[in-house]
């Protein structure tokens, strides 16, 4: 991640003025190598944390959500956790649920550690401790994510949560958390999705010929692509676009950019 480029983008977003209230999503593919189990991209996390520290010093407030990347998706894919209870492998699934939750806390600890290096205290809220159910309609009180204290930000992440029906468990995406945060916490001025390995929302996958950046997208505009289900057990770019569309009903500035 090029810090200078990122700062220029934030200027374009109108973030040079203070008193903004910003929700940032760090994509799992940005902060980890999604093809290798539990491999973080340390320099990218540090770069983002540096920018966040500048926002805080600018008297902005920030809520941080991060994805799972290779700390969650690979194990969840192996044991079909997104499908919920499967009788034939339920013992293995329950062990995988425990392991993924622990792995997500480990990844979150990395994020909080790098925030601390830049003088920011991250207060973590693992969804498995306070949320249940799936999609943006999940059950859980998110008001604590709106708490604001000097040099402190609230941090949460995509996680495996309980589901109070025959499914037993499922995956609550960070994108669904973003929708609820931007809808229910008052005063949000900006919502920023920092993506990994793509410059933003494209007309086609970045490796396909003719793929172009969409500078301003509406949900009437078609995007095509393939969801990399071998590495991502949520909705990939399609869920992000859908989530961004919902968020835009409440927040004027919604951005999807290359992290």
For each predicted feature, which ranges?
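Glycine-rich loop at the start of a catalytic domain that most often binds anionic cofactors/ligands
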Residues: 69-85
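Glycine-rich beta-strand-to-loop/alpha-helix junction loops that act as flexible
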Residues: 25-29, 65-69, 257-259
């Amino acid at each position: 991640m090029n810090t200078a480029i990122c700062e220029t983008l934030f200027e374009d977003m109108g973030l040079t003025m203070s008193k903004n209230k910003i929700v940032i999503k760090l994509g799992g593919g940005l902060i980890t190598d999604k093809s290798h189990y539990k491999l973080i991209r340390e320099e990218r996390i540090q770069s983002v944390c540096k920018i966040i520290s500048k926002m805080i010093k600018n008297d902005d407030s920030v809520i941080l959500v991060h994805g799972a990347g290779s700390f969650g998706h690979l194990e969840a894919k192996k044991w079909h956790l997104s499908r919920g209870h499967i009788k034939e492998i339920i013992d293995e699934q329950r062990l995988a649920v425990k392991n993924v939750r622990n792995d997500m806390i480990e990844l979150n600890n990395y994020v909080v550690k790098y925030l601390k290096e830049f003088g920011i205290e991250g207060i973590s809220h693992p969804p498995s401790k306070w949320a249940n159910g799936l999609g943006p309609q999940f059950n859980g009180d998110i008001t604590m994510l709106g708490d604001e204290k000097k040099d402190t930000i609230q941090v949460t992440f995509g996680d495996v949560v309980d589901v109070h029906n025959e499914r037993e468990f499922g995956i609550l995406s960070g994108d669904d958390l973003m929708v609820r945060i931007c809808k229910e916490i008052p005063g949000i001025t900006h919502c920023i999705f920092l993506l990994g390995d793509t410059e933003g929302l494209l007309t086609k996958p970045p490796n396909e010929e003719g793929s172009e950046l969409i500078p301003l997208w509406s949900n009437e505009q078609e995007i095509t692509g393939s969801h990399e289900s071998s590495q991502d057990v949520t909705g990939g770019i399609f869920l992000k676009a859908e989530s961004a569309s919902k968020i835009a009903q409440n927040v004027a500035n919604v951005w999807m950019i290359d992290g």
